[in-house]
């Protein structure tokens, strides 16, 4: 398994990983894959690599991308302030729970720091088991609503 930056021609995989990132509570029917075509979700992958803050680390298992952590400056669910990138992360189900997501997060935080960013935000549903991983890598809750936390990580200098 290697961790590397996403190559521009590989950017279409982010659409698939965005679908994988959708938290589906126990007993709830998964949404159609077309949900990622909604304008508020296309923000996460459309024309990725064309803007400042479009950074991505992938987990590559013998040539197959099995996970991705990416950031983008956008007005999304996790938006906190202008100029602060929002983060998304996803792994295929069979690779979860093995520490790969934590490594992806650390690598992306390093890449953000190298690119001059000092903070990054995300939105996560309160029931999502990934909340613990986000806290473990340094994210703190800055606001919440009935269903979600908005979290920010200060990237150490």
Locate each region found by the language model.
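A short beta-loop-alpha structural element at the N-terminal edge
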Residues: 1-16
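Hydrophobic adenine-recognition pocket in adenosine-nucleotide-binding enzymes
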Residues: 6, 89-91, 124
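Acetyl-CoA-dependent GNAT
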Residues: 22-24, 33-83, 88-92
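Conserved acetyl-CoA pyrophosphate-binding loop and the N-cap/start of the following alpha-helix
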Residues: 95, 99-107
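Conserved beta-strand-loop-alpha-helix junction that forms the acyl-donor binding cleft
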Residues: 96, 121-131, 147-156
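Conserved GNAT acetyl-CoA-binding A-motif
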Residues: 105, 112-125
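Conserved acetyl-CoA-binding loop of GNAT-fold acetyltransferases
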Residues: 135-145
């Amino acid at each position: 398994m290697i961790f590397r930056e996403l190559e521009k021609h590989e950017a279409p995989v982010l659409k698939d990983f965005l679908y994988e990132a959708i938290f589906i509570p126990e007993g709830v029917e998964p949404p159609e894959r077309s949900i990622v075509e909604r304008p508020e979700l296309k923000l996460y992958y459309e024309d990725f690599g064309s803007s400042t803050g479009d950074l991505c680390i992938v987990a590559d298992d013998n040539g197959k991308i099995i996970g991705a952590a990416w950031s983008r400056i956008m007005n999304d669910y996790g938006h906190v302030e202008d100029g602060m990138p929002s983060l998304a992360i996803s792994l295929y189900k069979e690779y979860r729970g093995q520490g790969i997501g934590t490594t992806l997060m650390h690598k992306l935080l390093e890449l953000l720091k190298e690119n001059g960013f000092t903070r990054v935000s995300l939105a996560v549903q309160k029931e999502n088991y990934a909340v613990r991983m986000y806290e473990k890598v340094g994210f703190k809750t800055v606001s919440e609503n009935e269903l979600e936390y908005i979290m920010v990580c200060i990237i150490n200098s």
